[in-house]
């Protein structure tokens, strides 16, 4: 979890804030939880600016952008789109449509749209599409490497149009990412049939009575944002062995307990680095890489060490693909490996170093990146370092 790229990417993130408490539509609930994408991008070493801080700037000269599009032959003036005229006589513009007002169209169909899109209405007014691409073009001209738009399902369709329009301006899909967040799908356990059944959407206030905010966030993020996220309200976040969030939190709490017991018994000595607060991504990355210096006595320990060392790469991939589910699944793998290892670890320096690394990694990723709470512990300080191991 270091600054993973040699060159820091400058990113503009547009994720309209939606207050969960006033959102009355289930599709917006999951969307409202995607604000953690900013954490994800920053922890992977990017410089992130929210679109709201840029949207108040004066819109540049739309006419100038419009003329640039025309000079690049990405637009044309006609009565109908190319998709319609293909089935008409070649001279239809000079004959049937000769007295019709001509309209400017952008060649978005060349980039995956199902038809070309209008840029200017017959009365001369510019369309919202042209206004939008002008604004985003302006942001790129200010030195941004990437623009990421995250929107609820109501924007389905416009994502294809806008992405294609930006490609007409020469920007790739990697530079301009438009992500539609799919909704949650609720399920509940039906006792009479002993089966899981889908249930109708319920209001956010009612949902939060059944599922904690932490569980709601976890199950919203552990599935790709572009896929519907199933959530079983009967078990989500409940203290059961089947719940993945509970297992992860249990692994963290077990790490805390073992470290605290070892310190109280004088087996190990830990000290705070000072300064408090979060550890920097660079510091954690260095600690994780140091695990490669040890020889592990058990397969579980070796697997856990490898999983922890892979965190910087997973974090980088998760940020690049706007895929927090990759981070969630990696955390699940860490917890699944940790739990059996924690029950059988022997008292030696490398195991306690691994224990501390696992605890700190879970803390930083779950709480500081994914904004999901952890169980209370009397040993919560994440800013610790291993000082001494006593063999007495």
Regions found by a protein language model. Give the residues of each.
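Non-catalytic interaction-recognition regions
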Residues: 1-392
